[in-house]
Regions:
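Asp-based, Mg2+/Mn2+-dependent phosphohydrolase catalytic module
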Residues: 1-5, 95, 102-185
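Active-site neighborhood of HAD-like aspartate-dependent phosphohydrolases
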Residues: 1-51, 159-160
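Hydrophobic alpha-helical core bundles mediating ligand binding, dimerization, or RNAP-core interactions
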Residues: 21-24, 41-45, 60-64, 98, ...
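Alpha-helical elements of Rossmann-like donor-binding domains used by nucleotide-donor carbohydrate transfer enzymes
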Residues: 27, 40-44, 62, 74-78, ...
Length: 185
């Protein structure tokens, strides 16, 4: 029985909106995926833009608030209507400051566990990332449904005993999840 659904953020739970970014925002956003941790990111950003870390964070906040939104506004409610005892978690590779996005979208209030690679020091698809996810959720691996849009992440999650769904963007996420859950009941 699934007790927790762990979502990847980008490409699964969140979608990217058409938001015209400033030159500074574009520079900062493009590097989200190219560096390994907060220290490296902010060292690069402060050097590149000649701004303080606080100024960089002030530029990032509008990016979280305008560029990203929930792929499906009522996804949590739809799942909880059918499975009221399920918990939610986030498992993402990203800069720690992404927490601002989660607050803006009320995701942090809905998710019991939030695991961000740059916070914990491990990235998907590493063994350590999945071990830490399981440890923080406090359920057995087979009680966790992991959803991601990267096949390698899905494969490794399954290798560590998690149930997993490879999410494809042309489908409705809640329907994909509910269909999967109904099949394994």
């Amino acid at each position: 029985m699934i007790k927790t659904i762990a979502f990847d953020l980008w490409g699964c739970l969140l979608k990217e909106n058409d938001y015209p970014m400033s030159e500074q925002e574009e520079i900062l956003e493009k590097q989200f995926w190219n560096l390994n941790d907060d220290e490296e990111y902010f060292a690069w950003a402060t050097k590149t833009l000649s701004l303080s870390e606080e100024q960089i964070k002030a530029i990032l906040t509008p990016i979280w608030e305008k560029l990203y939104s929930l792929r499906e506004q009522s996804i949590f409610e739809k799942i909880l209507k059918k499975y009221p005892n399920i918990d939610f978690a986030i498992a993402t590779n990203h800069i720690s400051d992404v927490k601002n996005s989660l607050k803006h979208l009320w995701i942090s209030e809905r998710c019991k566990t939030i695991l961000i690679s740059w916070d914990c020091g491990y990235e998907k698809p590493s063994k350590e990332f999945y071990e830490l996810l399981i440890k923080r959720i406090w359920h057995n691996a087979e009680e966790i449904l992991f959803i991601d849009d990267q096949e390698e992440n899905i494969q490794n999650a399954e290798n560590f005993g998690l149930k997993a769904i490879y999410y494809q963007k042309n489908t409705i996420l809640s329907e994909t999840i509910l269909s999967y859950l109904s099949k394994i009941e």
